[in-house]
From Swiss-Prot:
Coiled-coil residues: none
Gene designation: chePep
UniProt subcellular location: Cytoplasm
Protein name: Chemotaxis regulatory protein ChePep
Higher taxonomy: Bacteria, Pseudomonadati, Campylobacterota, Epsilonproteobacteria, Campylobacterales
Region feature Disordered, mapped onto this chain: 154-403, 420-465
Organism of provenance: Helicobacter pylori (strain ATCC 700392 / 26695)
Subunit architecture: Interacts with CheZ; the interaction is essential for each other polar localization.
């Protein structure tokens, strides 16, 4: 038999699990009718407990199917809440219990349904359990017989046991006494023996002195013989050591000779190589027809080859030491040469820097009058092109944006400091040369370097008016203090080339 629960409330499942434990029946819970119907059809031995909330959700077809299965088995219990007593979906269930209910109430209902004896299994029984226990105990006591006889037998047993215990104790005491007596007797015997030994010793002393003299002479003879034997024994090892000394000298000489031979002779690896060569030569010689002649002729070159190999290897060993020394000395020379070259390069670099500075100064002095002539030639061009001025002036939004040279030309004035400013423009790493300037700057900064081809291209595309404007903007952006800091320890070289105009231009 198994309890099958059709329920979706977890509290009810816990309550019925506790009831199933008391009934010692397994329980299975199903939330959906399809699973429940499949389980009910598998086995007919079950007790169905259904909840009205799940029964309300069933279709007409499912409810009719469930009603048929319940009617066949006749082991079904329905739980319902207040107000659902007369609902049609509760029809067919044999037992109905109202919610909420206690587990004991459900237990009683299930016990009645299962046909078990409620009086035996319920916790609140009519009979007192102590009465049942007493009845059973009296029945057992009647079978045991007279208690008085047992009570009389127990003291008799005790009296019988007591004398046996006393006898055992007495026996143990007697044994201990006997052991003590034996020990005392042994001690007395030992003492008597000691006394007898003490008495015997003076009697031995009273013996005649002749025995003592004889014993003394024998002792002396023994000592003399021992003394004689000792020097003989000492002489023997001395002779042995003397014999060993020349042997040691010979061994040392042999070792020295071996060392010399080993130094002169080739190493083990070399000997192996020589042996391999000898074997190869012997194999080659054995293959010939005349073995005896070839052996004699082969031995001579073999000896020669061995001697040559030995001499070559000894020479190689001797040469290895100076080679190592020469390698070390060569490495040291290379290092010193590298240091010297570095020093020379360091010393040459400032000279290279100083030479262009002096050349730049000379070129600068020559170029200043050229600039003046170029500027003089530029002024009539500016006068001849009043349209360009007007277009440029039209582009300026305010008077402040008009550069000073344009204003000066418009007013008919010349700027005398312009030539000086052109000569004193510093060379910075961030200054980018305009492609229309024919200026080559050589300074200590290595990043701004131009090839002569680039110079020629820049010369071809140069225009004097834009040159003046760029210089003027640069001078505006720099203050006097920044000019001073930039111009310190720096030189500027400007190269201007005059070329004939091409006929196409």
């Amino acid at each position: 038999m198994k309890m099958i629960l059709f329920n979706q409330n977890p509290m009810i499942t816990k309550l019925l699990e506790s009831v199933s434990k008391k009934l010692e029946l397994p329980i299975e819970n199903f939330n959906h009718y399809q699973e429940l119907s499949a389980r009910l059809k598998e086995n007919q031995e079950w007790l169905l407990i259904a909840d009205d909330e799940c029964l309300e959700k069933l279709d007409q077809v499912d409810w009719l199917e469930l009603k048929e299965t319940i009617s066949q088995n006749k082991n079904s219990v329905c739980m319902y809440k207040k107000g659902n007593e007369a609902q049609p979906f509760l029809e067919g269930f044999e037992v109905k219990i109202k919610k909420p209910f206690l587990p004991t109430e459900m237990l009683k209902v299930l016990q009645k349904k299962l046909g078990s004896n409620a009086s035996e299994l319920e916790p609140s029984q009519n009979l007192d359990p102590t009465q049942e226990v007493l009845e059973t105990n009296w029945d057992e006591l009647e079978n045991l017989g007279d208690l008085e006889a047992l009570v009389q037998e127990e003291p008799n047993n005790e009296e019988q046991l007591l004398p046996t215990l006393n006898d055992q104790e007495e026996k143990e005491e007697v044994k201990e006494e006997e052991k003590e007596e034996v020990k005392e007797e042994e001690k007395e015997e030992v003492k008597e023996e000691e006394k007898e030994e003490v008495k015997e010793t003076p009697q031995e002393e009273k013996k005649p002195k002749d025995d003592e003299t004889q014993e003394g002479e024998t002792l002396k003879d023994k000592e003399v013989s021992k003394e004689l034997e000792a020097p003989q024994e000492l002489e023997i090892p001395k002779e042995e050591t003397q014999e060993q000394d020349p042997i040691k000298e010979e061994t040392q000489e042999n070792k020295e000779e071996k060392q010399e031979k080993t130094q002169d002779s080739p190493s083990a690896q070399e000997l192996e190589a020589m042996q391999e060569l000898v074997k190869e030569i012997q194999e080659n010689s054995n293959g010939q027809e005349n073995k005896e002649k070839t052996q004699e002729s082969a031995e001579i070159p073999q000896d020669k080859e061995i001697q040559e190999v030995v001499t070559e290897k000894t020479q190689a060993q001797e040469l290895e030491v100076p080679k190592e020394k020469t390698q070390e000395s060569a490495e040291a020379l290379q290092e010193t040469q590298a240091h010297e070259l570095e020093k020379q390069e360091i010393a040459e670099t400032p000279q290279d820097v100083e030479i262009p500075q002096s050349q730049d100064k000379e070129v600068q002095e020559l170029e200043i009058p050229k600039e003046e002539t170029q500027e003089n030639t530029e002024t009539p061009q500016d006068v001849e092109t009043p349209q360009e001025k007007e277009t440029q002036e039209d582009h300026y939004e305010s008077i402040e944006d008009i550069p000073e040279p344009v204003m000066a030309k418009a007013m008919g004035e010349e700027l005398p400091f312009l030539n000086e400013a052109v000569a004193k423009i510093p060379n910075n790493e961030n200054d980018t040369e305009t492609p229309k300037e024919s200026v080559t700057e050589t300074s200590k900064n290595e990043n701004n370097t131009e090839t002569p081809q680039e110079k020629e291209e820049s010369d071809k595309t140069s225009s004097p008016l834009e040159l003046r404007l760029n210089l003027q903007d640069l001078l505006k952006s720099l203050n006097q203090e920044s000019l001073k800091s930039l111009l310190e320890n720096k030189t500027l070289s400007i190269k201007i080339t005059l070329e004939d105009k091409k006929p196409n231009a």
